[in-house]
Amino acid sequence: MDPSSKPLREIPGSYGIPFFQPIKDRLEYFYGTGGRDEYFRSRMQKYQSTVFRANMPPGPFVSSNPKVIVLLDAKSFPILFDVSKVEKKDLFTGTYMPSTKLTGGYRVLSYLDPSEPRHAQLKNLLFFMLKNSSNRVIPQFETTYTELFEGLEAELAKNGKAAFNDVGEQAAFRFLGRAYFNSNPEETKLGTSAPTLISSWVLFNLAPTLDLGLPWFLQEPLLHTFRLPAFLIKSTYNKLYDYFQSVATPVMEQAEKLGVPKDEAVHNILFAVCFNTFGGVKILFPNTLKWIGLAGENLHTQLAEEIRGAIKSYGDGNVTLEAIEQMPLTKSVVYESLRIEPPVPPQYGKAKSNFTIESHDATFEVKKGEMLFGYQPFATKDPKVFDRPEEYVPDRFVGDGEALLKYVWWSNGPETESPTVENKQCAGKDFVVLITRLFVIELFRRYDSFEIELGESPLGAAVTLTFLKRASI
């Protein structure tokens, strides 16, 4: 449909009676049949529109204004990345911002708008950290995930099954320490405590928007109505801070050159590694394992052949960037995992001025100051863009399918674009894609196939391995 021919439509939906309706909506969002997906789907069907007004949790008393304009289609969603039209200040977590007492008193990079001078300094610091670690990524990943798979094999041999998530989190943080700082955190004062420390600290940041599976009469007063006091987590946070302060010397020296005080740099490094990177991998690796596991042995055979063939022909028996580029199916299965189940479902942006947005069917007027909210799992399953959108299609992005990558937005921007100091796209976008490919590569270098069981988890999939078939060639 030509944009000029799309009818101008008033944004449907209402926010209801202040205070009472946001609480009612919060209860529906967390405890209604069908969960948050149904919260959005029912309204989309009611209003016959993928753009509508609604309240977003947490609401009272954590958030002063729960009102948002919801975007659920691939046409309207990208407005959230246009920083000329939307402001990104203090809305990383949505309609509320966690206390800066949880981040050393600083507004860390995720909460800064690109227009703020500190944004460019801190993002350049992360670019330096990524570049400085580039030569360590592949060898340290291989070392760490060989350790992981050896442990899983031993557990499987002993008990007939092996839970992936907890040991996977240990491996992920061990790898990040080795890759970024040339330091195995398990050989420091942290020991193996980092994943538990991080999860506790993240809970204090995100509690108002999390569903931990508790009964509503416990979860509502404890998590969703008032903020958890920051002082309760201070000693936990300080243990993480001390680790990064002790190992991140080259990054801190670069921070001073960029005009960022060392203390502020450490808090930002901690947030980037623990919240952004570890938090993403904690969800993404089990999800990827889940989808590939469910796809079955035929896909496993194809991946094993592609991966081993490329390593032999282009890497002289080793994993290299050149060899990885010759693995189109491997790349596609990672992108498809990121499409069908993006690790961070919500994105927000506040209108800088009056402007119009388009869905596939209509045009809508947005007023300055209104909050836009995109629920990514709907936008990346838009049936007007993707064939069989609800299915995991392993080769979706192979060949001509690469054209669809502009609709993959897990990184807070299109997969076809790159992070810069001028945008809010994830600084580690390419790093996360690379290590997820490496995860698939190490899996199929070692095994011909595997089988899994799935369980419940508040974040992502809980995966248990029930069978590992060692590589036959």
Swiss-Prot record:
Task: Report if keyword Metal-binding is assigned.
Answer: yes
Q: Which cofactor does it need?
A: heme b
Reactions this protein catalyses: (13S)-hydroperoxy-(9Z,11E,15Z)-octadecatrienoate = (9Z,13S,15Z)-12,13-epoxyoctadeca-9,11,15-trienoate + H2O; (13S)-hydroperoxy-(9Z,11E)-octadecadienoate = (9Z,13S)-12,13-epoxyoctadeca-9,11-dienoate + H2O
Supply the enzyme class, top level. lyase
Task: Supply the EC number(s).
Answer: 4.2.1.92
- Residue positions annotated to bind heme b are K88, H119, K123, K424, C426
What GO terms in the biological process aspect are recorded for it? jasmonic acid biosynthetic process; oxylipin biosynthetic process; sterol metabolic process
User: Can you supply one Gene Ontology CC term for this chain's record?
Assistant: chloroplast envelope
Q: Cite the CDD domains for this sequence.
A: CYP74
Name its pathway: Lipid metabolism; oxylipin biosynthesis
Tell me where on the tree of life, at the top rank, the source sits: Eukaryota
* SUPFAM superfamilies referenced in this protein's UniProt entry, alphabetically: Cytochrome P450 (SSF48264)
Got any disulfides in this one, which pairs? none
InterPro entries to which the protein is assigned, alphabetical: Cyt_P450, Cyt_P450_E_grp-IV, Cyt_P450_sf
Q: Is Iron a UniProt keyword of this protein?
A: yes
PANTHER family cross-referenced by the UniProt entry: CYTOCHROME P450 26 (PTHR24286), CYTOCHROME P450 SUPERFAMILY (PTHR24286:SF330)
Q: Member of which family?
A: Belongs to the cytochrome P450 family.
What's the name of the protein? Allene oxide synthase CYP74A2
- The species this protein was found in: Parthenium argentatum
| Primary gene name | CYP74A2
